[in-house]
From Swiss-Prot:
Its main location: cytoplasm. CDD domains: PH-GRAM_MTMR7, PTP-MTMR7. A 1,2-diacyl-sn-glycero-3-phospho-(1D-myo-inositol-3-phosphate) binds at residues 250, 275-276, 339-344, 384. One of its GO terms (molecular function) is inositol bisphosphate phosphatase activity. Residues 514-548 form a coiled coil. Heterodimer (via C-terminus) with MTMR9 (via coiled coil domain); the interaction enhances MTMR7 catalytic activity. Does not homodimerize. Interacts with RAB1B (in GDP-bound form). Residues 126-504 form the Myotubularin phosphatase domain. This is Phosphatidylinositol-3-phosphate phosphatase MTMR7.
Length: 660
């Protein structure tokens, strides 16, 4: 709070950048974690909350006659324009937000003060939801070819790798350590994904320190061990995700790529994904296009093309597709690396795994995938997403691009993914929000030193608790798209890359449909489920009525037999055979007939009993058709749609028995 110069400013206006609506007048509050704007309108009192950690840039614009404008751009692509009456207040807010948006210590981040009112046990259980040891068991590991290695115990070989890693059984500790010394940042080849049916694998590492002629026997033996761990193939692919020109330039610095003359039985492949600096500039250009007010279609498309953003998305997808096809169609193992093995390598390994394994296309599996290929393998979350004050040149939208690749796949295969677009945008939001501890720091080692799991909460448990909000209504476990690998079309023209309006313009309400396709389909699905439940209830009721009618027929036949053979008289005081007793008030219906035994008395039901035994299904609904009505209906309650038999007398079937 010591960084807040002015905690409250009144008569601030919030400008709607898309529509021509009048700016909302309200009060601006600065807290230790949020910027809050509260409208003055008594009928709405709408609030706009912005986390300090979400703020990307703050721009103080030239003072106008109406006040001093302040433009806040957020990392989740929200843009807020405020007009503050006094220039001094605007300057105080500006200086305060500059400091609050760039904390210098992890303890200043929101996750260390966030308290969702869960006890210690619930917090611990939340961190146990995603268990990577269980994930490797699901892959069929360990087996005859791969083993769990403790060579990196206490992070003594590579401080950016996890402590538990799977390596080929034939790779000794000496080979692993020797290979690590020949790799940038000591990130030696380790297993990322394993296909237990074909024994093909995806491994990852950093670039070798080969320069123009250097070689390392242990590194060559390591790659040979990966090849031998797949008896179905006599070679492995080595995929360098960088443009070849960039990789060659690294050779001059003593790094580079594998020399095929030194490594036996490898096939080398360059992909051509640009570095973090190119990606950062590309995103900036695309966002400038998104900020244009009422651009023409040609201007928007030209700006989007000029940014190169979708070309970069395609390059990442191409790399993932190449690796997935090598594993699924050729049965070959693949080693993937870029420069340091924590940016482009994470992107393409996770895209390939997503294409290969339907488990990663489920809600739980996608969390496991991010935990495995991004969090545990040392993606630099702090540096790439600016959690703390640091070098702005290190910031780059690496995981944003991966999330967009997943969205592009959901558009191409709408029935293959259990989760919807909202799930992806919420993950992207929390990468930057620092509300949970999952995406803090640059490595597993740093997170353990900071005791993240003891001091913060897990995002995965929060998403899992609210998983009903993230379900894809088109997903079916028995659909062909959910079985095995996703096979993308070979012709480039058959795969369409789209601008993701739901991500980059999701806060511009004027550019969004009134109801998303996902919400509409979920409403239709709920309506269908409700109708199915009503149908099932009607069928059960019909079956019950038929049973009652059958028992009534038996009772009638038993009553007629004694009257024929026993010679019972029909005196005036015989209540059982008096017609008016059957047609009168149902409450006066005798509970037992003199002509019946005890065992038959239970078969005689009153109208009240019949009515109370089943719900009234003839209640008509005055709902109008439409999505809004569909979305508010619930199978467990609320109004019901009129059924076909709603106009009939609901007691007509019972009356047949009562007249008998």
């Amino acid at each position: 709070m010591e960084h807040i110069r002015t905690p409250k400013v009144e008569n601030v206006r919030l400008v709607d950048r898309v529509s021509c609506k009048k700016a909302a007048l309200g009060t601006l509050y600065l807290t230790a974690t949020h910027v809050i704007f509260v409208e003055n309108a008594p009928d709405t009192r709408k609030e706009t909350w912005i986390l300090h950690s979400q703020i990307s840039t703050i721009e103080k614009q030239a003072t106008t006659a109406t006040g001093c404008p302040l433009l806040i751009r957020c990392k989740n692509f929200q843009i807020v324009q405020l007009v503050i009456p006094q220039e001094r207040d605007c300057h105080d807010v500006y200086i305060s937000l500059i400091r609050l948006a760039r904390p210098v210590k992890y303890e200043e981040l929101y996750c260390f003060s966030f308290n969702p009112k869960l006890d210690k046990e619930e917090r611990e259980q939340g961190w146990l939801l995603v268990d990577l040891s269980e994930e490797y068991k699901r892959m069929g590991l360990p087996d005859n070819y791969w083993q769990l290695s403790d060579v990196n115990r206490d992070y003594r070989v590579c401080d950016s790798y996890p402590t538990e890693l799977y390596v080929p059984r034939s790779a000794t500790a000496h080979i692993i350590v020797g290979s690590s010394k020949f790799r940038s940042r000591r990130r030696f080849p380790a297993l990322s994904y394993y296909c237990k049916d074909s024994h093909a694998s995806i491994c990852r590492s950093s670039q070798p320190l080969s320069g123009f002629s250097a070689r390392c026997l242990e590194d060559e033996q390591m790659l040979q061990a990966i090849r031998k761990a797949n008896p179905g193939s006599d070679f492995i692919y080595v995929v360098d995700t960088r443009p070849k020109l960039n990789a060659m330039a690294n050779r001059a610095a003593g790094k580079g790529y594998e020399n095929e003359d030194n490594y036996s039985n490898i096939k080398f492949q360059f992909i051509g994904i640009e570095n973090i600096h190119v990606m950062r500039n590309s995103l900036q250009k695309m966002l400038e296009v998104c900020e244009l007010k009422s651009p023409s279609m040609s201007d928007f498309l030209w700006g989007l093309e000029n940014s190169g953003w979708l070309r970069h998305i395609k390059a990442i997808m191409d790399a993932g597709i190449f690796i997935a096809k090598a594993v699924s169609e050729e049965g070959a193992s693949v080693l993937v690396h870029c420069s340091d093995g924590w940016d482009r390598t994470a992107q393409v390994c996770s895209v390939a795994s997503l294409l290969l394994d339907p488990y990663y296309r489920t809600l739980k599996g996608f969390m496991v995938l991010i935990e495995k290929d991004w969090i545990s393998f040392g993606h630099k979350f702090n540096h790439r997403y600016g959690n703390l004050d640091g070098d702005p040149k290190e910031i780059s939208p690496v995981i944003d691009q991966f999330i967009e690749c997943v969205w592009q796949l959901t558009e191409q295969f709408p029935c293959a993914f259990e989760f919807n677009e909202r799930f992806l945008t919420h993950i992207q939001h929390h990468v930057y929000s620092c509300q949970f501890g999952n995406f803090l720091c640059n490595s597993q080692k740093e997170r353990r030193e900071l005791k993240i799991q003891e001091r913060t909460y897990s995002l995965w448990s929060n998403l899992w608790k609210n998983r009903a909000d993230y379900l894809n209504p088109l997903f079916r476990a028995d659909h062909s798209q959910t079985q095995g690998s996703l096979h993308l079309p070979t012709a480039p023209c058959n795969f369409t890359y789209k601008f993701w309006n739901g991500m980059y313009n999701r806060f511009e309400k004027g550019l969004q449909p009134r109801q998303s396709v996902t919400d509409y389909l979920m409403a239709v699905k709920e309506e269908s489920q409700q109708l199915e439940e009503e149908l099932e209830s009607l069928e059960e009721r019909l079956e019950k009525i038929q049973k009652v009618h059958l028992h009534g027929t038996k009772v009638k036949s038993k009553q007629s037999e004694p009257s024929k053979h026993s010679g019972f008289s029909t005196s005036d005081h015989s209540t059982a055979n008096t017609p008016q007793d059957y047609s009168g008030n149902s409450k006066s219906f005798p509970s037992r007939s003199p002509s019946q035994g005890d065992e038959d008395s239970a078969l005689i039901l009153t109208q009240d009993n019949l009515k109370s035994s089943d719900p009234d299904l003839s209640v008509n609904s005055d709902q109008e058709s439409g999505v809004e009505d569909l979305s508010c209906r619930s199978p467990s309650g609320g109004e019901h749609a009129p059924s076909e038999d709603s106009g009939k007398d609901r007691d007509s079937d019972e009356a047949v028995f009562l007249t008998a």
